[in-house]
From Swiss-Prot:
Catalytic activity: D-glyceraldehyde 3-phosphate + pyruvate + H(+) = 1-deoxy-D-xylulose 5-phosphate + CO2
Native species: Alteromonas mediterranea (strain DSM 17117 / CIP 110805 / LMG 28347 / Deep ecotype)
Annotated thiamine diphosphate binding sites: 80, 121-123, 153-154, 181, 288, 370
Example GO biological process: terpenoid biosynthetic process
Note describing how the cofactor binds: Binds 1 Mg(2+) ion per subunit.
The organism's place on the tree of life at top rank: Bacteria
Keyword Transferase: yes
Binding annotation for Mg(2+): 152, 181
Cofactors required: Mg(2+); thiamine diphosphate
Cellular component aspect of the GO annotation: cytosol
GO MF entries: 1-deoxy-D-xylulose-5-phosphate synthase activity; magnesium ion binding; thiamine pyrophosphate binding
Protein name per the record: 1-deoxy-D-xylulose-5-phosphate synthase
Length: 625
């Protein structure tokens, strides 16, 4: 249910940026307060990303107030913080649909709005894209401003610094707004720094600086002295030397919750040439006390009552696959002091909190640095450690060369615990784990496993750990099947499947379902309805070729079932094996199509793409009638 904007009178006057820019500046504080209240009341009704948006309310208002969006380009890194942007760009009354099937996209999404200038979802891409847009604007002679907003966490990634280095080198007009919401760069925020920021963007300082540079351009020793003097003045009170060294004019830090200070500073910066960096300090969860106190807990929230000042207790359910991994990691580390676990800034999401506390000397959070995480794991493995890299499927895409070049070619014993494989649901196309089967199975030396329940997951993790070669265990987001894992850990026979159900009728008139991964319950449900054989393949690579040939020879048709893309996936592996052995058999491959999967619940997406029991039954009937 959408909120009534009549209860937010100032926000009702600023539902699009052009209307926002008609407001007098003294109304912006009031607008920011209403926008924050609207965000709180909206997300609490729908669920979604929360704390980041609360922290960027004033910054969002100021950016749309100063810049002529959408002509001026505004890019949000990752996009968790972009809910206020969506509200101010004509989508307030659709916020009740965010992250739902056929609803608003969870992140900035160009097909949804002209104000969403670049599709995002992963970290640290905005500066590169903004620089490309700045060059394009110059080539086309458009007097367009380009602004990238990036958080201090995303700024730790190598890609961000690659872009900063390039931007500082070619000196194109662009603004990078560093949203520092963890105080990780500087705690030196207050009246002095806000005053200094305004001073450094003011006409007086910049006319002196630019004029002085021109005046002294032919006197190198004096020019160098002047530059050092300016650097020394700024360096005494500004933590921006690194950005200056990269070729940016650094401004800040300023209070990101003082909307008028942000407006004044941005307005001054509009007239600057070359790359500029504005450092704003914000509070994640600003305006909602419990979110300020625990921004990680309130980063993404379920539906809740704001008056309770707490999130609802989750209903008892089966442990998540992330929790199964976390428990295995603790159990294994207790036995193996050489186990070293690596995560690229996903400790909570990957289920590693307890492990990090119990085994701090065996735990490494390398920040948002997927490429480094994989090669760091390779280095650990090369010199005798048993490396475990815990990473989301969609984030492993960012380290594909390292996976091949640094791990697989050297056949190093690195275990990849791949969370969020397959359909993840509400986060949409940037986060679906659709491609890992296809991009892993083509790599020599890799062993790829797909568990169908919690116990299978635990045993596969143990198998990969003991294998002493590159291995991957891919498992889905969310709760498991309710299977209690065996406490004992047993290595599985590599490349061997298990038969879960045999048809009771003549096999030559029936279908065999070859299941890869978490869709096994759907396969079994369908098999009961149509009396089919079900084989849980377990291994995507090496494939249980004997089981495939036996099923093909005994049954009238095969169905392959996976939660990844069909092209190059596990079904493709089955077809390749049949072809190599000269077997001609009717095969229906069920998986994800050649398109990006939008947001919606996992169950909605399974149903839409024919991966639930109903879809499997329909596929079987299309084969055997």
């Amino acid at each position: 249910m959408s909120l009534d904007l009549q209860h937010y009178p100032t926000l009702a006057l600023a539902q699009t940026p052009d209307k926002l820019r008609q407001l007098p500046q003294d109304k912006l504080r009031e607008l920011a307060d209403e926008l924050r209240e609207y965000l709180l009341n909206s997300v609490s009704q729908t669920s979604g990303h929360f704390a980041s948006g609360l922290g960027t309310v004033e910054l969002t208002v100021a950016l749309h107030y100063v810049y002529n969006t959408p002509f001026d380009r505004l890019l949000w890194d990752v996009g968790h913080q972009a809910y206020p942007h969506k509200i101010l760009t004509g989508r307030a009354e659709r916020m009740s649909t965010i992250r739902q099937k056929n609803g608003l996209h969870p992140f900035p999404w160009p097909p949804e709005s002209e104000y969403d200038t670049f599709a995002v979802g992963h970290s640290s891409t905005s500066i590169s894209a903004a620089l490309g847009m700045a060059v394009a604007a110059e080539k086309e002679g458009k007097d367009r401003k380009v602004v990238s907003v990036i958080g201090d966490g995303a700024m730790t990634a190598g890609m961000a610094f690659e872009a900063l280095n390039h931007a500082g080198d070619i000196k194109k007009d662009m603004v990078v707004v560093l949203n520092d919401n963890e105080m990780s760069i500087s705690e030196n925020v207050g009246a002095l720094n806000s005053h200094l920021a305004r001073l450094l963007t003011g006409n007086f300082f910049n006319s002196i600086r630019d004029g002085g540079k021109k005046l002294l351009s032919n006197v190198p020793p004096i020019k160098e002295f002047a530059s050092r003097a300016e650097e020394h003045l700024k360096g005494m009170v500004v933590p921006g030397t690194i950005f200056e060294e990269l070729g940016f004019n650094y401004i800040g830090p300023i209070d990101g919750h003082d909307v008028n200070a942000v407006v004044d500073t941005l307005r001054n910066m509009r007239n600057f040439d070359g790359p500029q960096l504005l450092h704003v300090v914000t509070k994640k969860g600003k305006g909602y006390a419990v979110a300020e106190e625990d921004p990680i807990k309130f980063h993404a929230v379920p539906k809740f009552n704001p008056a309770d000042n707490a999130l609802p207790k989750s209903k008892p359910s089966a442990p998540t696959y992330s929790a199964i991994f976390g428990q295995w990691l603790c159990d294994m580390a207790a036995q193996d002091p050489k186990l070293m676990a690596v995560t690229p800034a996903m400790r909570e999401g990957s289920g590693m909190v307890e492990f990090s506390q119990r085994f701090p000397e065996q735990y490494f959070d390398v920040a948002i640095a997927e490429q480094h995480a994989v090669t760091f794991g390779a280095g650990l493995a090369k010199d005798g450690m048993n490396a475990v890299v815990a990473i989301y499927s969609s984030f492993l895409q960012r380290a594909y060369d390292q996976l091949i070049h640094d791990v697989a070619i050297q056949d190093l014993p690195v275990l990849f615990a791949i969370d969020r494989a397959g359909i993840v649901g509400a986060d949409g196309p940037t986060h679906q784990g659709a491609f890992d089967i296809a991009f892993l199975r083509c790599i020599p030396n890799m062993v790829v496993m797909a568990p169908s329940d919690e116990n299978e997951c635990r045993q596969m993790l143990y198998t990969g750990h003991k294998l002493q070669k590159p291995a991957a265990v891919r498992y889905p987001r969310g709760a498991g099947m309710g299977v209690t894992p065996d406490e004992a850990m047993t290595a599985l026979e590599i490349g061997k499947s298990r038969t879960c159900r045999e048809t009771a009728k003549d096999k030559s008139e029936s279908v065999a379902i070859l299941n890869f991964g978490c869709l096994l319950p759907y396969a079994l449900e369908a098999a009961v309805a149509i009396d089919a054989t079900v084989i849980d393949m377990r291994f995507i690579k090496p494939l249980d070729g004997d089981a495939v040939l036996k099923a093909a020879n005994e049954h009238s048709a095969l169905i392959t079932l996976e939660d990844g893309c069909i092209m190059g996936g596990a079904g493709s592996a089955v077809l390749e094996h049949l072809q190599q052995n000269g077997v001609l058999k009717a095969v229906k491959m069920l998986g994800l199509p050649d398109s990006f999967i939008l947001q919606g619940t996992q169950q909605e997406m399974y149903k839409e793409h024919g991966l639930d029991a109903e879809g499997i039954i329909a596929a079987a009937k299309s084969l055997i009638g």
